[in-house]
Amino acid sequence: SPIIVADEDIENFEMIQKKYVTPMAQDAVKNKSIKQWALIKKVPGIGNPDNKTNYMWVAAFDNINQMVNRENWWSNTEKKFGVPSEVIYDSPDIVRRGRYIYKTEKQIQTDKPGQYVILNWATPTNLNKMIELQGSVEKHFRKNIIKSGMVGWGMATRIVPQNKDLPTAFWWDSYDTLENAYKHLVGQGANEGISKEINEEFNKLIPNGWDNRVIFEFVTGAN
């Protein structure tokens, strides 16, 4: 879920997320309400300055049943901390930019924490062929995952909302440092040595290129 936090509220917002929300997210993971949760923030100075989104809440679920039946775990503040949620969340003001749900199609997970993640959106001309191609991409990335600094990768397809102006596919590339994330963007990192055939097929499936690519930094999370 993308959100906007005013500059003057950032310090207080992150404090609340780390001190209160993260422990409750850890409880939710333990109780099988969610699989993972994270707060990430946009690396400043990149992209369109008119796009004010600067944070995202990211939640992962084991299945649809878990997603639709999960409790509002973030509201358990009084039980856990003795403070009503309306007091904790009274400030700062947060502008929510909607909720977007994806189905993970391919994924690489490691036990190493990622510090930066590249978020990529595109609209393939043939979504099924793109998913199939990601099997070859995954095999290549797994060969380079240690030496490149990549600690996670995945590809997902959009479930909701759906309309003609929204990309249908989403990728994430998680790295240990900002430098290694930038290397990925210029064809190095885990991309290095990928076959010409894979690149050509990928570019053929997204002839207009990426719809959007941004870098976010990990703030806090639970898994």
Locations of regions flagged by a protein language model:
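Short S/T/G/P-rich N-terminal loop/turn motif that feeds into the first structured element of a domain
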Residues: 1-77, 86-223
